[in-house]
């Protein structure tokens, strides 16, 4: 077909039904968002955990927060003087810092 004929048909559709074009633009934007966040959306759908289970899983034992820490990390904490006692505020700070690092990967 000729390009002018196709453009004329598109113009005719725009004049008759402009909501179709608006729907097409919104669909395109939704598709872009879905394509960029598809892996996160898949993980959310496959996950059957509730928010309470996630919070329980992420809870840190304040009595011994260094239970699963590597040796080199412990040595670095000793040089900073943080190996013996950690306040709850520090644990919250470390948790927020770790979450921000995970988000910015």
Curated annotation (Swiss-Prot):
Subcellular location: Membrane
Keyword rRNA-binding carried by entry: no
Membrane topology label: Single-pass membrane protein
Disulfide bonds, paired cysteine numbers: none
Transmembrane segments: 5-25
UniProt protein name: Protein U4
Gene it is expressed from: DNA-U4
Family from the record: Belongs to the nanovirus U4 protein family.
The keyword Transmembrane belongs to this UniProt entry's keyword annotation: yes
Domain of life: Viruses
GO cellular component, one term: membrane
Keywords: Membrane, Transmembrane, Transmembrane helix
């Amino acid at each position: 077909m000729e390009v002018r004929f196709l453009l004329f048909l598109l113009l005719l559709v725009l004049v008759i039904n402009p909501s179709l074009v608006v729907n097409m633009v919104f669909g395109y934007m939704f598709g872009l968002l879905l394509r960029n966040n598809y892996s996160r959306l898949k993980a959310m759908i496959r996950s059957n955990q509730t928010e309470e289970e996630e919070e329980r899983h992420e809870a840190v034992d304040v009595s011994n927060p260094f239970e699963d820490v590597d040796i080199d990390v412990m040595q670095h904490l000793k040089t900073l003087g943080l190996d013996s006692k950690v306040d709850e505020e520090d644990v919250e700070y470390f948790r927020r810092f770790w979450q921000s690092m995970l988000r910015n990967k």
